[in-house]
Amino acid sequence: SQQVSTGFRHDDCQFYMPGFWYRRNLRSPKEAPSFHTSDSWLVREDRLSSPLTGIYSEKAKRFVTVNRLDKFESDALTTHREGEVILSGKTSLGFTGFENRDGIATLSFGFPYREAPKSYIRKLTLAPQVEAFQFLKGGETVVLNWVVFEDAAEDFSDFIRHTWEYCYDTYAPKPVDTPYSIEEMKSTLSS
């Protein structure tokens, strides 16, 4: 795993992981990921709408983000959902998040995935942390690409605007093409 120190005091910061974490998540119930549980969170990249973590310093009016640029093409099953797990095959999923390292806000990311201090199974369900390991044959390599970006923002809203626009431009989301109608999907999900 890799860590990038922002140099910002952790207590002066707000945090963002698209679709998962906004500010300090203090309005979330205690069963959901929030500062009520921990001030450091690492999650699988597929838990997020974009594989990105951002830290905004309200005092410095600056932010630092890390995002993954690789294609996510595979995942592998495990026999366990907590503790140290060995993957059954290849995965392209890593992790991203933020940590309080001796009072300094730090971006953390790596491969394969880790979730700490808890794993987020589904809405309002936290489980013990997990750390995955993938077998590599001698001489085999895995090339991964993350981008660390730093800039200024007038406030947290400006930081979110900038980051959202960056994610939209970078990942260019498109509607999902499905052979099923909305009515068929609703019928299947409700039965």
Pin down the residues of each PLM region.
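Long, contiguous hydrophobic alpha-helical segments, chiefly transmembrane helices and signal peptides
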Residues: 53-55, 107-112, 142-148, 163, ...
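Beta-strand/loop-rich accessory regions of lumenal/periplasmic or secreted enzymes
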Residues: 1-138
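Short Pro-Gly-centered flexible turn/kink motifs
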Residues: 133-158
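Low-complexity, Ser/Thr/Pro/Gly-enriched N-terminal "stalk/linker" regions
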Residues: 154-191
